[in-house]
């Protein structure tokens, strides 16, 4: 492989920025729920010579020559994905979760058809019918939300809305929802109104793969996911189905329907990540992700901060900052000031705009990857509460920074890279 000094010799400006980003990741508590730290093996595959190869088509059905080894690695990724999720068919080529969803829409829908997913402000996703996304521009989008009292999905309301709007595609799976999803109930609702059912499990895929969350594959027509987040792979997408014939149509919607050449270096990294996820250690990791999230949520509640829906059953939680008379925008800035990376987020029935919000989204996957356990997440919860409840006290801010620094030092990111190097790839 390429010597670590090569990038610094060729482009010292970019090398320096990469080094700075490594320093930022090392010195911050990463609590953005959609982020994680991949293994060095995943990064090595992604930085390999496979980036040089065009490979339009599928294994053994390529439009370019010289794909014999590309075919092998992509088939490994396909086989491992199918094994992980119990699927009959997998397409590992989508560049991202949004592209995976677009391919599903192209397969199952025509412009003007009706779709129904969760409202973005309640925890849904842009690609589930938001008016600013192609899914909301090409299709008639309707949305369901959570119950105002429980802040959890009201399946009776979903059924009522589905009967009213008669969607051709019903979507479940969310970007900021902390409770278990009942895919069996969604299947029953879809069947009652004659809809296809899509589960977008981008956030919970790693938990599903290890049995820590119910598997949607037996119940849904199609399942999409990203390959990073809780799955801890490279940034990319994945499509799964239990229907092999439908799988063939989905393949055509990926290529040539919505993409050209696949990113085979990323697919190799997906194969590595799927292999890691099949190991017992990854199941232990996923269980720890859930335990750590619960510890964080409980500590925040003990410090009198409100958690949407009363807690978390997965890796993510929303702090309703109206309990401390603060906006998400302000909280995001306060967290950044003590080297905690999180993101402002709308909460259900939020009176603030998406650019301001009343919530802060937190997640446990990344810092769990660095080896932290419940004890550390209790400490993190205490730091967060201390800062949010004393926003004007710079003395407390400094103490919070010191506590963050101590945690980061105790759980280094990529210890083999701790020495200052010009390139991390």
From Swiss-Prot:
Its EC number(s): 2.1.2.1
GO cellular component, one term: cytosol
Superkingdom per UniProt: Bacteria
Gene3D superfamilies on file: Aspartate Aminotransferase, domain 1, Type I PLP-dependent aspartate aminotransferase-like (Major domain)
Function: Catalyzes the reversible interconversion of serine and glycine with tetrahydrofolate (THF) serving as the one-carbon carrier. This reaction serves as the major source of one-carbon groups required for the biosynthesis of purines, thymidylate, methionine, and other important biomolecules. Also exhibits THF-independent aldolase activity toward beta-hydroxyamino acids, producing glycine and aldehydes, via a retro-aldol mechanism.
N6-(pyridoxal phosphate)lysine carried by residues: 229
Name of this protein: Serine hydroxymethyltransferase
Coiled coil start-end: none
Organism: Trichodesmium erythraeum (strain IMS101)
Gene Ontology BP annotations: glycine biosynthetic process from serine; tetrahydrofolate interconversion
Subunit and partners: Homodimer.
Gene: glyA
Residues flagged as site, Plays an important role in substrate specificity: 228
């Amino acid at each position: 492989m390429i010597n670590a000094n090569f990038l610094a010799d060729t482009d010292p400006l970019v090398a320096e920025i990469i080094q700075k980003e490594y320093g930022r990741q090392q010195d911050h508590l990463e609590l953005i729920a959609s982020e994680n730290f991949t293994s060095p093996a995943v990064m090595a595959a992604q930085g390999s010579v496979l980036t040089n190869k065009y490979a339009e088509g599928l294994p053994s059905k390529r439009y370019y020559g010289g794909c014999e080894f590309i075919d092998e690695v992509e088939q490994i990724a396909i086989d491992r994905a199918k094994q992980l999720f119990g699927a009959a068919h997998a397409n590992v080529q989508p560049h991202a979760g949004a592209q995976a969803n677009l391919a599903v829409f192209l397969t199952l829908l025509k412009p003007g058809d009706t779709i129904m997913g969760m409202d973005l402000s309640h925890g849904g996703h842009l690609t589930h019918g938001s008016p600013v996304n192609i899914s909301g521009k090409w299709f008639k989008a309707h949305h369901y939300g959570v119950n105002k009292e429980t802040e959890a999905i009201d399946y009776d309301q979903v059924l009522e809305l589905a009967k009213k709007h008669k969607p051709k595609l019903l979507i479940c799976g969310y970007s900021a929802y902390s409770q278990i999803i009942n895919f069996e109930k969604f299947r029953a609702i879809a069947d009652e109104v004659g809809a296809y059912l899509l589960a977008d499990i981008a956030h919970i895929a790693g938990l599903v793969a290890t049995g820590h969350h119910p598997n949607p594959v037996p119940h849904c027509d199609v399942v999409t996911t990203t390959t990073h987040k809780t799955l801890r792979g490279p940034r990319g997408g994945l499509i799964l189905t239990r229907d092999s014939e439908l799988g063939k149509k989905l393949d055509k919607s990926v290529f040539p329907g919505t993409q050209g050449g696949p990113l085979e270096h990323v697919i190799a990294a997906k194969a590595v990540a799927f292999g890691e996820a099949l190991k017992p250690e990854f199941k232990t990791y996923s269980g720890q992700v859930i335990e750590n999230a619960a510890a964080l949520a409980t500590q925040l509640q003990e410090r009198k901060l409100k958690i949407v829906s009363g807690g978390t059953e997965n890796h993510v939680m929303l702090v309703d900052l109206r309990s401390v008379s603060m906006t998400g925008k302000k909280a995001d800035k306060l967290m950044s000031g003590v080297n905690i990376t999180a993101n402002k987020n709308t909460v259900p029935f939020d009176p603030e705009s998406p650019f301001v919000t009343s919530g802060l989204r937190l997640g446990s996957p990344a810092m769990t990857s660095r080896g932290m356990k419940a004890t550390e997440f209790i400490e993190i919860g205490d730091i967060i509460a201390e800062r949010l409840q004393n926003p004007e006290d710079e003395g407390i801010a400094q103490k919070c920074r010191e506590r963050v620094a101590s945690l980061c030092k105790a759980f280094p990111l990529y210890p083999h890279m701790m020495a200052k190097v010009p390139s991390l790839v």
